[in-house]
Amino acid sequence: TFAGQASTLVNRMLVSGLAEGSLAALNYATRLMGLVPGVVGTSIITVMYPTLSRLAARDGWSRYSKAFSESIKMISFVLVPTAVGIAVLRVPIVRIVFERGAFDTEATKATAWALLFLSPAVALFTLRDMTNRAFYALQDTTSPMVVSIISAGINIVLNLILVGPLAQGGLALANTLSSAFGA
């Protein structure tokens, strides 16, 4: 969406004013964080979306609501502990995955700093995507779009506030907090 692209543009402009390597650290942390929702989250959503669509079309609100609630519980049960684990083990994770050659200890620290603030997004991004699919199952495409625009606005404001005190970690935290609104 345009709002998402504007948010990304502001993010890139702000990170370009930070220390050398900040953009790379943020990108590497984002890649690591995106693996779990990309694999686990997508699997859950792929299974639940057809069920939600069928229930929304035929079986009424009660069963649809229960199925949606169960999918949120399942996502939370799997991904909240995963997010905590990533936050706690962020330095060894980054070291094992990336630290070699030009990616030195300082790059590990910078990436782990961003990953700390992105780790809750492991669950939040999947919850957001599940919620969007729940709206789509109801034939409602407007609500996710409105939420996306508001989330992008929140992200831009938080980027401006948090980049100073937290550097690339602030940009990561802004992304996480704005995704919490969308979840």
Listing of model-derived features with the role each one plays in the protein:
Residues T1-A183:
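Membrane-embedded alpha-helical bundles of multi-pass transporters/translocases
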